[in-house]
Amino acid sequence: LRAEFCIRAGDENYEAFPWECSLQMALILTENALECRYLVTNRDQAPMPFGIGLHPWFLLPEGTEKVRLRLPAETYFETTPDLLPTGRRLPVTEMPGHDLRRFTDVAALDLDTVFETQGRDVTLRYADRGYDLVISVTPDFLDSVVFTAFNRGMEKTGYRAFCVESQTCCTDAINLSEEGLADSGLMVLAPGGTKEGGVVYRFEMKKGGEG
């Protein structure tokens, strides 16, 4: 499945993002994986800042079945009361419930947090079902957002869902870069330039004895 989104001068979206550009997305389904590829093209005459993020939803199983998350991040971004990153990085060991380097029960988490995963794999373990869901990214995806919507308002809908979002930059990267944060992950494309990358969601059978 392929799709393309374009912004041109005069478009409504151009008022919010004043660069002529295009985003192509390709979804490639195989026997045990879904690959999501992007291609961004700057069709403008000026350099264009941008970032890419994927926002998949995952349901918590019913009953006693658990989903465990392993996220290889040593640091996360401090946030304002509005949950926007300040640009300050903190060790995950300084905040309870933020060190996810070992498999952790998702239902026990309460997060809307940007972690620095630096292109490393993130894993969801469905031990009762006998498999892992491994999220692999190209090196441009520097961050992962964990959002436990099931205890942040969404529980009123009757759905118990959470997100693990792969992002090439931290949330609000354009404003943070304007404020002087040089390593927000924001990418800048020269006129006529292109950038591509992607995320793969891959099912792997769990090895015997792993829980």
Language-model features, listed with the residues they occupy:
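Short Pro-Gly-centered flexible turn/kink motifs
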Residues: 38, 187-205
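Active-site/ligand-binding surface loops and adjacent short beta/alpha elements
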Residues: 47, 60-140
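Extended, loop-rich substrate-binding clefts of extracytoplasmic carbohydrate-active enzymes
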Residues: 1-31
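Short, acidic/polar linear motifs in exposed loop/turn regions
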Residues: 44-45, 205
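Acidic/His-leaning functional-site neighborhoods
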Residues: 105-182
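Beta-strand-rich interaction surfaces with strong enrichment in secreted/lumenal proteins
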Residues: 24-26, 184-189
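Asparagine-centered strand-capping/turn motif at beta-strand->loop junctions
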Residues: 38-44
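Histidine-centered catalytic micro-motifs
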Residues: 51-59
